[in-house]
């Protein structure tokens, strides 16, 4: 979104991706994550955290923080930044690193202090093959409980990513959980309440680019050209079960659109080390994301107001907002 009287910075002319040196890469803010991967993956390395959509720009992602499937292990995308350069409101080029005040107010700072122009990113080894396990749950409470059980396995590295979703199923909802590993190890699912329904081995890039098949479908049906009024909030874990159940009771499939879903992902507060990215006070929070793909502009029109209503309800229970959300925000927000 854009504030009243705001400025759009076109960074397309600053999209260079530098050489990979000692598990680091210097990237200009206008580059896309797809372009970053094109430089790092042939070296067997990837950024520790990537957004689900690889065609987002690096600078745009870092302005809001950046949440991805690996956030539960490695934090926000901004937590993978090891140095940055930006232009302040005074027109000065400023460079900063961890420990500098500027470093902490620019990352996820919404461009209020400086516009990021160049960053250095930490890289991690990329698995050759990943295994995507899909589990189906009887209700949201058991899905959230399984996510909590998997946190220790995430820390140990036995699990690379955990992402829950709730998809429309007739007049009801089907909760499902995606567990991603770098080895075919059924034992990693031991003790979970969800019923395994599929396991799919795939190249690392196919998993990182998993949003691409959906985008192709949306483009083919014309839905990609419609507005995408998404909402992302962070729920305190202690209230998550009740909050999610309450919002699902209010939602219908048409509120999300034919390809929409609700995304639920666990985020340990300690994993996120970006001060400007606001999270609830609980040690664990749950990313609650309404992924809306309306069938028409008429269907999309009421969705920003509906997003506002959802946010106002969950905020009373201690939830916080991820600012890359579609509704009109005030200075108080």
Locations of regions flagged by a protein language model:
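Short glycine-rich, acidic/polar surface loops and turns
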Residues: 70, 162-169, 270-280
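Hydrophobic N-terminal alpha-helices or hydrophobic patches in metabolic proteins across all domains
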Residues: 2-4, 12-14, 38, 48-51, ...
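Conserved glycine-rich FAD pyrophosphate-binding loop
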Residues: 4, 197-333
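N-terminal glycine-rich flavin-associated loop
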Residues: 9-99, 123-146
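C-terminal substrate-binding/cap subdomain adjacent to the FAD-binding core in PCMH-type
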Residues: 63, 82-242, 258
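Short acidic-glycine loop/turn motifs at beta-strand connectors
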Residues: 4, 20-22, 87-90, 168-171, ...
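Active-site-adjacent structural patch at catalytic or cofactor/ligand-binding sites
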Residues: 8-10, 188-194, 288-293
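Short, glycine-/Ser/Thr-/acidic-enriched flexible segments
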Residues: 14, 32, 63, 69, ...
């Amino acid at each position: 979104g854009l504030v009243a009287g705001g400025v759009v910075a076109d960074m397309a002319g600053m999209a260079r991706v530098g050489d990979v040196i000692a598990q680091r890469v210097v990237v200009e803010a206008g580059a896309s994550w797809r372009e970053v991967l094109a430089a790092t993956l042939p070296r067997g390395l990837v950024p520790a955290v990537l957004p689900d959509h690889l065609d987002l720009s690096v600078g745009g992602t870092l302005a809001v923080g950046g949440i991805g499937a690996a956030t539960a292990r490695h934090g926000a995308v901004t937590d993978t930044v090891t140095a940055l350069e930006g232009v302040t409101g005074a027109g000065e080029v400023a460079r900063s690193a961890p420990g500098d005040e500027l470093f902490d107010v620019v990352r996820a700072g919404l461009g209020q202090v400086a516009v990021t122009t160049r960053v250095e990113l930490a890289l991690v080894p990329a698995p050759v093959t990943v295994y995507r396990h899909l589990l189906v749950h009887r209700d949201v409470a058991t899905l959230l409980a399984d996510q909590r059980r998997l946190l220790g396995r995430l820390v140990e590295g036995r699990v690379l990513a955990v992402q829950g979703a709730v998809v429309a199923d007739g007049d009801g909802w089907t909760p499902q959980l995606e567990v991603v590993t770098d080895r075919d190890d059924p034992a990693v699912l031991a003790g979970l309440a969800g019923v395994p329904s599929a396991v799919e081995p795939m190249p690392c890039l196919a998993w990182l680019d998993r949003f691409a098949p959906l985008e192709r479908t949306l483009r083919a049906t014309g839905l990609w050209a419609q507005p995408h009024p998404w909402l992302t909030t962070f729920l305190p874990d202690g209230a998550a079960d009740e909050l999610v159940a309450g919002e699902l009771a209010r939602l219908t499939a048409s509120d999300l659109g034919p390809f929409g879903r609700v995304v639920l992902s666990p985020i340990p507060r300690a994993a996120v080390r970006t001060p400007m990215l606001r999270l609830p006070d609980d040690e664990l929070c749950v990313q609650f994301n309404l992924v809306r793909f309306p069938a028409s502009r008429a269907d999309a029109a009421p969705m920003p107001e509906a997003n506002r209503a959802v946010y106002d309800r969950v905020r009373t229970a201690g939830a916080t907002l991820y600012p890359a959300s579609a509704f009109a925000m005030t200075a108080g927000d």
